[in-house]
Amino acid sequence: MGQKIHPLGFRLGITQQHRSTWFAPRKLYVSWIHEERQLRDYLKTRLADAGVANVQLTRQSDRIEVEIHTACPGAIVGRTGQGLEILREDIQKRLPKVRRVIVHVVEIANPDAQAVLIGGIIAKQLEERIPFRRAVRQAVQRAMRAPGVEGIKIEVSGRLNGAEIARSEWVREGRVPLHTLRADVDYCDCTAQTIYGVLGIKVWIFRGEIRPVRQVLAPGT
């Protein structure tokens, strides 16, 4: 079960949270979904070099909050903060029905423990024709040096190093318990566009277990 299902969706409500928080009337539900998809695609393209790991959206009837978790906040905010205002205005133009747009930028304290950022580094190296084993080995070493990381697994699929027959290879170091629901497992899948075709990259990072806090009641209560 844990080997097949999506690691993040499997843990929603336990160690993972929804990346969108809103409720829409029945008539607006479809249009809001399309607007969110367009907004996320725009942010993915606009902030491709800003080290964005996650985007949280909170929406009400006439207001939307965009929380961007990034390893390079300066690339978004700019020196004087003007970049953040330009980004907010661009989002406002794409959402004309929303009266107020609020953008928050949150700096990631431990970027090497984020699967999205590790996967992006591997994809960039593969597109620069670096041998996939070297790229994967460097990514594993980089992640295992990050505080809190207890294990990592990386799988690369496709025409590796230009081979005629596509195959899959994976590397794992440490523990990556996919069946344990309380395990804090971060996951991402991305692609690398090479001259030989598209390579698929999957990254699992295990950051320890999150155990619920039990309240001990005093005698007589």
Swiss-Prot record:
Alphabetical list of CDD domains matching this protein = KH-II_30S_S3
Q: Which domain of life is it from?
A: Eukaryota
Compartment(s) where it occurs, according to its Swiss-Prot or TrEMBL record: Plastid, Chloroplast
What's one Pfam family here? Answer: KH_2
Taking the record's annotation, the residue ranges forming a coiled coil are none
Domain KH type-2 span(s) in chain numbering: 39-109
Instruction: Extract the InterPro entries matched here.
Output: KH_dom, KH_dom-like_a/b, KH_dom_type_2, KH_sf_prok-type, Ribosomal_S3_C_sf, Ribosomal_uS3_bac-typ, Ribosomal_uS3_C, Ribosomal_uS3_CS
- Give the GO terms filed under biological process for this record: translation
A GO molecular function held by the record: structural constituent of ribosome
Kindly give the PROSITE patterns that the UniProt entry links to this protein.
KH_TYPE_2 (PS50823), RIBOSOMAL_S3 (PS00548)
Principal localization reads: plastid
What do the Gene Ontology cellular component annotations say? chloroplast; cytosolic small ribosomal subunit
Which keywords accompany this UniProt record? Chloroplast, Plastid, Ribonucleoprotein, Ribosomal protein, RNA-binding, rRNA-binding
Name the HAMAP family on file: Ribosomal_uS3_B
Family (UniProt): Belongs to the universal ribosomal protein uS3 family.
Q: Assembly state and interactors? A: Part of the 30S ribosomal subunit.
Q: What is this protein called?
A: Small ribosomal subunit protein uS3c
